Amino acid sequence: AKSLQRVISKVGNATLMTNVTTASGFATFIITQSKLLTEFGIVASLSIIAIFLLCLFIIPIIYSFMPIPKEKHLQHLNKQWINQLGDWIDRTVKHHNIAIYSSAVILLAVSIIGIFQIKATGSLIEDMPKKAEFYSDIEFYESEFNGVMPLEIFIDTKRKKGVMKLTTLKRMSKLENLIVEIPELSKPISVVSLVKYSKQAYYNGNPKYFQLPTAQENNFILSYAKNASSDVDLLKNFIDSTGRYARITSFMKDTGIDKMERIEENIISEIDKLFPKERYDISLTGKAYLFQKGTKYLVRNLILSLALAIFLISLFMAYMFRSFRMIIISLIPNLLPLLITAGMMGYFGVPIKPSTILVFSIAFGISVDDTIHFLAKYRQELLANKWAIKKSVFAALRETGVSMFYTSIVLFFGFSVFVTSNFGGTVALGILISATLLLAMLANLLLLPCLLLSLERSIANKKILKKPTLNIIPEEEPRQEDKNRRL
């Protein structure tokens, strides 16, 4: 019972803060204004806090009814490879700090170059399993019909029966000619095609009359088009009942967001030339256009959520350590892995899209947990060792290094499970988060202690490293050996 009480009193607050920072990383998705991501952020953050409370209350109760662990149950703590790992970390931090800094700077420089190669793109079906039957069906329709995603141009003539004016039809025809020249788009369908077919039919199907009517032909050709079907008025598929509104429908191939943007720019520039704004209101719509705009909007919101996650976690660090320098030191080993991962995305051609931008908020919220544990233990060792810097750093490293390694490896393999998914976005999420957490572990085990040792004069004093607002890890109780010496 005393051991359980001691564990709770020693690590309870630290565990609370690590869970709060992780929950904050997920909670930032709430501001994305995407219903699915908002629900994900709420459920994930609340679940993390709920798990903390359950562990805090249930695990001690269960352990209180269990027998004391036998020696064989604790043998994993004394395994040779664990001691060798600790020795290697100590030697590396103590004797190779220049190599650590050089490696960090080189990786940062290379990553920045890679970041500039990242493209913000994405397509509707690129993450779907390539071996699925429906994927083959989509490819078939794309090859045979030049696209599967509708792109529509909505035209408001601002007056009744304005669509059927010959000037409007000619403007629409010129716009359709541009669309035909774009390889990613299918041949457009609109009232213009119906009018052209009507004229051709009027002249006994002669192909050379597949064109808009002249001013003299306009009235009787249009009446012919209206009466072309006795059952269905074909015009209703292209214009409204008042004749004021019309639409041009085309289908787009599954292309990246960057190509969609160029297509949109070309179409809009042509629209501005053909349709005077004082006489027409033109707008683009359709699934292709909405997907492109929605993806860009979502990426912007997710970048904002990442910035908010960094800001919130910085506030938590400020609340805990009350030192600006400690905030900077704690952020460096956690931001560096994010930059390296972003650089890797640039080099390997992984685009920024909703399924990959999620990585950074999640990974940052999780990786900062190790930093909190280490810095909290470091401060405790400083107080216990009367501000002896090196001794405190290596004592904290020995105390927390193994647990940081274990938790990071568990998380690494936990997220690696996503690699087995058939959905491309889930695979990318698993690979990138796993890689980021592994890099964050190395940064917290190697770079963070080096920073503390290098900046010892500027941070290891009572003015800078003030007593934390929240007593994350209480001061060590006097050991029995020390008590005996005093007696």
Give the residues covered by each predicted segment.
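Transmembrane alpha-helices and their membrane-interface boundaries in multi-pass membrane transporters
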Residues: G12-I31, L36-L77, F374, A428-L465
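Pore- and gate-forming transmembrane helices of large, multi-pass membrane proteins
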Residues: K2-T32, L331, I366, L383-S421, ...
